């Protein structure tokens, strides 16, 4: 299978997830950054908005985003209203809490939105690949990998 990655989705806008999104944007690739809706805000994208804004100023230096205009490569959204954004992505990188049950819930939620040949990756440091792939359809299992970006991603 030949696969050319043109657009990436990163799910999880914490320090590592937003850092991965910045790394991708720094390479002039389009990236979608998604996270949950903040419970304490009327803005459904508060978490990802804050993460994107902080990419210019995180410490230690250098900040994750090399140049301010690279932020234009990042589209933000949330996991309630913006799942359709996943349909455009060739690679989906999950960077959420290290709890198997929560990861499985997320995978089940996003599977209907995956492109037929999209690669799905978990940026885990503790969970085995076979456990992550449990109960996934066979056509997804064959495209599921583990990535491991260190903190901070650069």
From Swiss-Prot:
- Record's SUPFAM superfamilies? NAD(P)-binding Rossmann-fold domains
Q: Where are the transmembrane segments?
A: none
Give the highest taxon in the source lineage: Bacteria
Any GO BP: fatty acid metabolic process
Give coiled-coil spans as residue ranges: none
Q: Name one GO molecular function term.
A: oxidoreductase activity
Report any Pfam family annotated for this entry. 3HCDH_N
Under which name does UniProt file this protein?
Putative uncharacterized protein RC0842
**Organism in which the protein naturally occurs:** Rickettsia conorii (strain ATCC VR-613 / Malish 7)
